[in-house]
Amino acid sequence: SADLLSSIGLTDIRRIFRHKNVTKSTSIDEKKFTNEELRKIAFHIRINRPMSLYARCWIFVEGETEIWLLNEFASMLGISLQAEGVRLVEYAQCGVAPLIKLAKQLGIEWLLLTDGDEAGYKYARHAVNAGNEDRVTILPSIDIEHFLYENGFENVYRRNTGETSLKGLNENKIIEIALKRNTKPGMALAIVDEARLIGKQCVPELFQKIFARSLVKSNTS
């Protein structure tokens, strides 16, 4: 159970799974992690997200906004990520490197979604340099907010600025005002509400491809 997992040490965890009709048992080799990495993943995964250890595939995303949106978009497409053994795991507080190492040691498949800014490319390079290019998706925009603005949800940001006139304001300024007025999680919920009104056709193709890949990896893990 999740309660049991959160109460025992990382190195005491054993994950049993089938791969190509062979049953395997995996555990964590703490020698492959620094003390700081062990501390971070113990808190981030074992204590805060123990149920993620039961997943067959992790999708690493930057933060809370992506968690809200991707779960909702998947649901709109008739996909229950949890039922499919897929878990969204935010990496902003922990970093990508230790989470990828953890997934590999436990035999959990994974995908990475990063922003298109400098930090996002840094995370992506780390994964690609380890030979995982096919697992990495970089947003074609500097962050999730700009991506959504440019892919069907511009009106949501414009509406949530609270301004009667947006004349002379560019995309960056409109997003900045909307986020300042509503916060990032608040805007995520506004996007979700709009998406529910429009229907599944509004789900960006990039996200649809990530879901499809995650299901393939989950079902072959």
Go through each PLM region and give its residues.
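RecA-like P-loop NTPase motor core
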Residues: D3-A119, E133
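Generic structural signal for hydrophobic core residues of well-folded globular domains
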Residues: I8, F73, L148-G152, V156, ...
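Activity-critical C-terminal alpha-helical subdomain
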Residues: D115, K122-D193
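Terminal low-complexity/disordered tails
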Residues: L189-S221
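Hydrophobic transmembrane alpha-helix bundles
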Residues: S1-I8, T34-R39, G120-N129, F153-R158, ...
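Exposed alpha-helical structural elements
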Residues: E36-K40, P98, D143, N155, ...
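Conserved GHKL (Bergerat-fold) ATPase module
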Residues: A2, P185, L197-I198
